[in-house]
């Protein structure tokens, strides 16, 4: 940014832009519960010699019967109850699209810049500021990154032989997001554990946080 000059008329300039970004890679993830669970079990068996899920053959048969249901069919509910491990528990048989439930493909960005410069006979000045905001990928409770820049540049001629100058800068940024975990695990754990066979909310309205249907 150019500095102000002595005996210069005040000049104010502003520029800003708005843009929207989206992923350039494919987000066409597996949303059929049968295949999602089967793949997880296959790789866990190959590496850990134990399945990832605790689905029975009957569960997999039910998942197979539902594999083409884009939405829940009342005749083939996505959550049923069964007595296991000595208690009644939910068994998840869904075809759930976790990516589009958790994440938003559209990420808007706002950027505002203002600059003021000028000067008098003995003083030149320049003041500039910037505000930047970008929405993150989270859909339900959007995460947000914001940054603030501020700069003041002054030069004063006190005497012909004495000039005082200052250049002050300020920067602050923050990233606000919701969730129990840090930002790393907020993305890592759904990637590892949110099988398409699971749903986010139980029939009784409680959130699905942990389930005995997996080994995690």
Whereabouts are the PLM-identified features?
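Short, mixed-charge, low-aromatic patches
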Residues: 67-72, 105-112
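Generic recognition of flexible, low-complexity loop/linker segments
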Residues: 102, 112-115, 152
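Non-cytosolic beta-sheet module surface loops
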Residues: 106, 117-118, 130
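Outer-membrane beta-barrel channels and translocator barrels
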Residues: 109, 120-121, 157-161
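Surface-exposed loop/interface segments of Gram-negative outer-membrane beta-barrel transport/assembly proteins
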Residues: 5-95, 132, 136-216
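Outer-membrane beta-barrel domain signature
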Residues: 100-105, 139-141
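A beta-strand signature from Gram-negative outer-membrane beta-barrel systems
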Residues: 1-13, 109-111, 124, 130
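Residues that define the transmembrane beta-barrel architecture of outer-membrane proteins
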Residues: 108-112, 119, 144-148
């Amino acid at each position: 940014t150019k500095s102000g000059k002595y005996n210069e008329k005040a000049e104010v300039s502003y520029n800003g832009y708005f843009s929207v970004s989206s992923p350039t890679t494919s987000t066409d993830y597996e949303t059929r519960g049968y295949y999602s669970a089967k793949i997880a079990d296959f790789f866990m068996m190959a590496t850990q010699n134990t399945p990832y899920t605790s689905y029975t053959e009957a569960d997999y048969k039910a998942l197979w019967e539902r594999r083409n249901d884009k939405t829940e069919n009342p005749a083939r509910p996505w959550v049923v109850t069964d007595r296991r491990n000595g208690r009644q528990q939910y068994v998840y048989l869904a075809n759930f699209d976790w990516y589009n439930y958790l994440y938003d493909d559209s990420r808007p960005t706002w950027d505002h810049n203002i600059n003021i410069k000028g000067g008098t006979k003995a003083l030149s000045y320049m003041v500039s500021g910037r505000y930047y905001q970008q929405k993150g990928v989270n859909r339900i409770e959007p995460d947000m990154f914001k940054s603030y820049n501020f700069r003041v540049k002054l030069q004063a001629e006190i005497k012909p032989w004495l000039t005082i100058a200052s250049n002050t800068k300020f920067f602050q940024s923050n990233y606000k997001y919701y969730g129990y975990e840090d930002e790393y695990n907020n993305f890592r754990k759904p990637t590892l554990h949110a099988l398409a066979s699971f749903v986010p909310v139980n029939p009784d309205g409680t959130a699905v946080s942990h389930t005995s249907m997996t080994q995690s």
